[in-house]
Amino acid sequence: MIAAATPAPPAAIGIVVRDLTLRLNNRVLFDKLNFTLDGGQCAALLGASGVGKTSLLKIIAGLTPADADTVSGSDGLPLAGRIAYMGQKDLLYPWLTVKQNITLGARLRREKAESDWADYLLAEVGLDGVGACLPAALSGGMRQRAALARTLYERQPVVLMDEPFSALDTLTRAKIQALSARLLSAHTVMLITHDPLEACRLSHRLWVLAGQPARFLTGLDLAGEPPRAPDDPAVQQSQGALLRQLLGSAE
């Protein structure tokens, strides 16, 4: 029954940002920023704290107002209603079961929860059998897996991730990185991270945001598909190049 509930992956759409300008507290954060992320690709977004990474994700998500037609999908249509978001904190409601947390979006929209789909995702993230548990019974890594399942439950083609694994221990983080790369392979993903190795393991493109107003430095493209092995020579080489770019942007 669970396998039958597995839907086709969402149709890949890219992210297009044109002439984005944003002023916050008399500071020009972005001035005519332009970029495109192809559908089905993952871009890692890095840069110093306060440079505007989270502000950019909030604009794309529609949480911070922007001028009309500044942000769109590669199909020319608005991205509203086609985005899922995953942050650093799992934001699980402690009084709801794990499964109820995963299906919360449907309930808030007054839709019937898709129980089989939720069960399938719980199994995919290694939480089979804990759907009836409260979040307090889960470890930090298990809670973040539940948050990943909740993100996937929405079946949105674009996923925005703001340091989703930074609070986890090294071993748990490596496992969930690999899991998320596999489960999000059909989605368009923008990932904020401060970890060069994580960026090189999980993304197709590396973008460093720097300056005031903020702009993208020369991007780095990575060969092959995520997740990449941490000891892959190409990953190590890309990590070194990325770190040099980050250090240069801080001077």
PLM feature spans:
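The feature captures the beta-strand-to-loop junction immediately N-terminal to the Walker
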Residues: L46-A48
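Helix-to-loop junction immediately C-terminal to a conserved catalytic motif
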Residues: A61
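Conserved ABC ATPase "signature" region
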Residues: A113-V130
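Conserved ABC ATPase signature
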Residues: L134-L138, M142
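Hydrophobic anchor residue at the start of the ABC signature
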Residues: L148-A149
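A short, proline-enriched helix->beta-strand linker immediately N-terminal to the Walker B motif
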Residues: Y153-P157
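Helical segment within the ABC ATPase nucleotide-binding domain
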Residues: R173-S185
